[in-house]
């Protein structure tokens, strides 16, 4: 299940992985997913909920987490527009199994292109490391949770274990992002001033 209002990059990765999208209406006061409509949209085939914390507004995570727990659903978050937002003292983007953040132009941090995914699931993290790099084993740690690496650097340099993409960040993007992190609090403060104006 996905919210009906977002950017295409919220939806395309789900579709590219072969999952069926089902759109859920929004709450007009928050522009986030309507919690009542969310629960009504759940079927026996529903596997996950992709939330978008739109324009600095965190979702109603207490209610949505209960729904996900009751129905055995995975919660994912697109937090591209809400870096620094919090719900009950916890940062938006850290409630779901994965939280995604964009570093494209006009977002809180800009590295020209790219983004950040966060998770506390180590196995999933290892899958993401491989997928971002063509499905290679090269960038996996020696104690990988998804693949037993051989003690042969040549072999691992050319071993692909799954379909993947070429979405590794460039060093210049990382350097830009590190410098902007130092200014993140002031960026957020200015965005909040702009929202009130």
Which sequence ranges carry the predicted segments?
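PLP-dependent aminotransferase-like
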Residues: 1-70, 74-79, 86
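Short, hinge-like loop/turn segments at secondary-structure boundaries
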Residues: 39-41, 67, 91-95, 117
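A generic hydrophobic-helix recognition signal that picks specific residues
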Residues: 46, 70-72, 90, 114, ...
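Active-site region of PLP-dependent enzymes
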Residues: 82-88, 95-197
């Amino acid at each position: 299940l996905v919210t009906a209002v977002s950017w295409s990059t919220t939806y395309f990765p789900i579709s590219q992985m072969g999952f069926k999208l089902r759109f859920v209406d929004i709450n007009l006061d928050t522009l986030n997913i309507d919690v009542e409509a969310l629960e009504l949209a759940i079927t026996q085939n529903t596997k996950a909920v992709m939330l978008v914390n739109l324009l600095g507004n965190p979702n109603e995570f207490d209610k949505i987490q209960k729904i996900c727990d009751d129905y055995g659903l995975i919660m994912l978050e697109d937090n591209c527009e809400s870096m620094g937002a919090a719900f009950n003292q916890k940062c938006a983007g850290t409630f779901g199994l994965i939280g995604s953040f964009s570093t494209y132009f006009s977002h809180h941090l800009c590295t020209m292109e790219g983004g950040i995914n966060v998770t506390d699931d180590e196995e999933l993290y290892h899958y993401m490391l491989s997928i971002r790099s063509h499905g290679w084993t090269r960038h996996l740690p020696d104690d990988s949770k998804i693949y037993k690496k051989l003690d042969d650097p040549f072999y691992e340099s050319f071993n692909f274990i799954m379909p993947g993409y070429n979405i590794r960040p460039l060093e210049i993007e990382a350097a830009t992002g590190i410098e902007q992190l130092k200014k993140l609090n002031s960026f957020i403060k200015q965005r909040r001033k702009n929202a009130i104006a």
